Design a protein with these regions (language model features):
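A short beta-strand-loop-beta hairpin characteristic of the jelly-roll/cupin
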Residues: 64-87, 97-101
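A short glycine-rich, His/Asp/Glu-containing loop-to-beta-strand
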Residues: 16-70, 140-171
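Hydrophobic alpha-helical membrane-insertion signals
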Residues: 1-24
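Ligand-binding loop in jelly-roll beta-barrel domains
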Residues: 97-126
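Long amphipathic alpha-helical segments that form oligomerization/scaffold cores
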Residues: 122-147
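Generic beta-strand structural signal
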Residues: 84, 90, 102, 114-116, ...
Length: 171
């Protein structure tokens, strides 16, 4: 299947949490009506001052967040008693459901911190489910070599290979 690119939208530079610099791609005024995709951010810097303040405790409700760490380290804690640790190539899958307060705090590293976070809106019937949390380590994520690159399957199925992510949205 071939598709044409009809428009290119640049993300906007902004900050979130306690001043973490990031680029918001979905969720900006240019691109904000893509339900179930609520938000898509790229974060990354070589300068610890751009990210070290992290994302102190804050609430979420009614959606899932999927964080993919390309480089760096983040520590997760939440009000449901979950704790996790993200490092190079790992994924954090958090379902906020009826509500959770959590923090994502970076740990200083010698190199660059870089990653992506996607927010997926939960269907109405699932908005009040129990919060859940899952760390997926890089070694648990299968990949497929293609002619022009490599595909990592975090969730769903591609070419007969199933990813370890368990979404509530069907994505």
């Amino acid at each position: 299947m071939n598709r044409n690119i009809t428009r290119i939208v640049d993300g906007i530079q902004t900050s979130d949490g306690a001043g973490v610099k990031l680029k918001r791609i979905i969720g900006s005024p240019e691109l904000n009506l893509l339900d179930p995709f609520l938000l898509f951010d790229e974060f990354g810097s070589d300068n610890p001052e751009d990210y070290i303040a992290g994302f102190p405790p804050h609430p979420h409700r009614g959606f899932e967040t999927i964080t993919y760490m390309l480089n760096g380290k983040f520590r997760h804690k939440d009000s449901a008693g979950n704790e996790g640790f993200l490092s190079d190539g790992s994924v954090q899958w958090m379902t906020a459901g009826r509500g959770v307060i959590h923090s994502e705090m970076p740990e200083k590293t010698d190199g660059k911190v870089r990653g992506f976070q996607l927010w997926l809106n939960l269907p109405k019937k699932l908005k009040m489910i129990e919060p859940s949390y899952n760390d997926i380590q890089s070694g648990e994520i299968p990949s497929i070599e293609l002619e022009n690159g490599k595909v990592k399957i975090i969730s769903g199925k591609f070419n007969g290979v199933k990813g370890p992510g368990i979404p509530h949205t069907g994505m």
